[in-house]
Amino acid sequence: MGSDTLSCTFLTALIHAPDVDVAAVVTQPDRERGRRMQVLPGPVKELALMHCKPVFSPVKVNETEFLDTLRHLAPDVIVVMAYGQFLGKTLLALPRLGCVNLHVSILPRHRGAAPIQYAILHGDRETGVTAMMMDAGMDTGDILGVVRREIRPDDTTGTLALELVKQGAD
């Protein structure tokens, strides 16, 4: 589950991992984009379709109809990165091994949206990518691992985001 270009790096790593079967991809619905405001798919959907993966784009991820679809897929694990919707308890309980979130900060610092921007804004000396088991809270589950990276004076949100996602995907 993911919705932005950063999510694509993680999805690419999962698709190419020899011991992983990406059964489906969940992303946000197509929306108006660009200067002409055409309804277009997001980057995660485009990537998934390029790799012939089934794509689901529920307006509300916790609705019964979509939960039934997930039950039918019977995933071992659900991996989430920058998805943009809160996962309810029913959804979190569906995969056999749970849901794993990849978050671009060293949790618990900078939970929620815009963690890279907040790390720079607050003058943090380091940041990273945290892999965690998801629970009902916002970025509050058990931490599985952290990859750390120093924040350099010349870092921007863009450069830092690209490096963190690449490190996290490895």
PLM regions: where:
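N-terminal Rossmann-like dinucleotide-binding module
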Residues: M1-R36
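A structural signal for well-ordered alpha-helical segments within the folded catalytic domains
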Residues: T5, G42, K166-D170
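Structural motif corresponding to alpha-helix initiation and N-cap regions
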Residues: C8, Q38-P41, E63-L67, Q85, ...
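Positions that flank functional sites
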Residues: D30, N62-E63, D135
